[in-house]
């Protein structure tokens, strides 16, 4: 059993964040330039809308994350701050808009993600493919990571991603098997593993996944999830601290200590991952450009 955590005593208690979760405000010339561009042209990035703690660091390295297919999700995951409900009509101009944003911001490495669109027959996979194509046309030097939904495991939809060949394809497990139904009620642990394995088996050179800690998982469950990901051929894993977006979301059960994150990094590397990003403030796209190597 994992005891290297700082417990939160009750479901309703919201304790102050430990010192290792406090971050400095982003600064620097490159960050300021990009911040001004985003504000001037009303560019939409997850970095800003999600108030990512790593925004300044990533932008300074020329990396940013964009969300497509609207901002309303058909799923209601207990950890996620994205709105849920009836999504907007598909904007077929969105691929060009995202590509232009990347060009304006002079992004070297772009991460693209999306809400789940279970309301669409193709689950959004056509817009996904068109977005990658548009980015390639307008930004031929920019490398790409696509952080995709599970597309309900539909291989034809996953094939559309494979056909446009992003440098990295990521799909997040989010949590351990025991907690999957509670944390990702419309998702399935084994289906997510199958998606990752299918990507690797069908030509994606670099696959990636991420998990959050602090939802009540035990150390042995985290290690088993890492083993499952390696068995599926995953190359890169990110491990970070879950933070409750609002009182309506799942509570934080534990604040994981820096020493425990370092332990998981060591275990992950021993299991054979090419890269393991493991610390409290790590998010899916943290140090994303490094994962090309």
From Swiss-Prot:
Give the metabolic or biological pathway.
Protein modification; protein lipoylation via endogenous pathway; protein N(6)-(lipoyl)lysine from octanoyl-[acyl-carrier-protein]: step 2/2
Highest taxon listed in the record's lineage: Bacteria
Could you tell me one molecular function GO term of this UniProt entry?
metal ion binding
- Location of the protein in the cell: Cytoplasm
- InterPro entries (UniProt xref): Aldolase_TIM, Elp3/MiaA/NifB-like_rSAM, LIAS_N, Lipoyl_synth, rSAM
List the PROSITE patterns hit by this protein, alphabetically: RADICAL_SAM (PS51918)
Pfam families attached here?
LIAS_N (PF16881), Radical_SAM (PF04055)
Bound cofactor: record note = Binds 2 [4Fe-4S] clusters per subunit. One cluster is coordinated with 3 cysteines and an exchangeable S-adenosyl-L-methionine.
Cofactor entry: [4Fe-4S] cluster
Keywords, A to Z, come to: 4Fe-4S, Cytoplasm, Iron, Iron-sulfur, Metal-binding, S-adenosyl-L-methionine, Transferase
Question: Which of this chain's residues are annotated to bind [4Fe-4S] cluster 2?
Answer: 73, 77, 80
Give a GO cellular-component term. Answer: cytoplasm
Catalyzed reactions: [[Fe-S] cluster scaffold protein carrying a second [4Fe-4S](2+) cluster] + N(6)-octanoyl-L-lysyl-[protein] + 2 oxidized [2Fe-2S]-[ferredoxin] + 2 S-adenosyl-L-methionine + 4 H(+) = [[Fe-S] cluster scaffold protein] + N(6)-[(R)-dihydrolipoyl]-L-lysyl-[protein] + 4 Fe(3+) + 2 hydrogen sulfide + 2 5'-deoxyadenosine + 2 L-methionine + 2 reduced [2Fe-2S]-[ferredoxin]
Sequence ranges assigned to domain Radical SAM core in this UniProt record: 59-274
EC number assigned by the record: 2.8.1.8
Residues at which [4Fe-4S] cluster 1 binds: 47, 52, 58, 285
Q: Which family does it belong to?
A: Belongs to the radical SAM superfamily. Lipoyl synthase family.
Q: Which protein is depicted? A: Lipoyl synthase
Please spell out the taxonomic lineage of the organism that makes this protein.
Bacteria, Pseudomonadati, Bacteroidota, Flavobacteriia, Flavobacteriales
Q: Which gene encodes it?
A: lipA
């Amino acid at each position: 059993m994992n005891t290297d955590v700082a417990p939160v005593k009750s479901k309703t208690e919201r304790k102050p964040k430990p010192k290792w979760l406090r971050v400095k405000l982003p600064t620097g010339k490159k960050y300021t330039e990009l911040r001004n561009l985003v504000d001037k042209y009303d560019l939409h990035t997850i970095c800003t809308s999600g108030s990512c703690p790593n925004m300044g660091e990533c932008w300074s390295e020329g990396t940013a994350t964009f969300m497509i297919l609207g901002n309303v999700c058909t799923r209601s995951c207990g950890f996620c701050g994205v709105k849920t409900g009836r999504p907007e009509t598909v904007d077929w101009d969105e691929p060009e808009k995202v590509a232009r944003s990347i060009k304006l911001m002079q992004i070297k490495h772009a991460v693209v993600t999306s809400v789940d669109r279970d309301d669409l027959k193709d689950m959004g996979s056509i817009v996904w493919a068109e977005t990658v194509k548009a980015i390639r046309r307008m930004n031929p030097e920019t490398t790409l990571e696509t952080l995709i939904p599970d597309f309900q495991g539909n291989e034809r939809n996953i094939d559309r991603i494979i056909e446009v060949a992003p440098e990295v394809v990521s799909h997040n497990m989010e949590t351990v098997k025991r907690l999957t139904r509670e944390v990702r009620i419309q998702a399935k642990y084994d289906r997510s593993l199958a998606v990752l394995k299918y990507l690797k088996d069908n030509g994606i050179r670099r696959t990636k996944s991420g998990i959050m800690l602090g939802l009540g998982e035990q150390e042995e469950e985290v290690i088993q999830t890492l083993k499952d990901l390696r068995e599926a051929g995953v190359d890169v894993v990110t491990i970070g601290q879950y933070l409750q977006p609002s009182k309506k979301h799942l509570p934080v059960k534990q604040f994981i200590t820096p020493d425990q994150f370092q332990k998981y990094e060591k275990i992950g590397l021993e299991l054979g991952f090419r890269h393991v990003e493991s610390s409290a403030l790590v998010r899916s796209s943290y140090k994303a450009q490094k994962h090309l190597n």
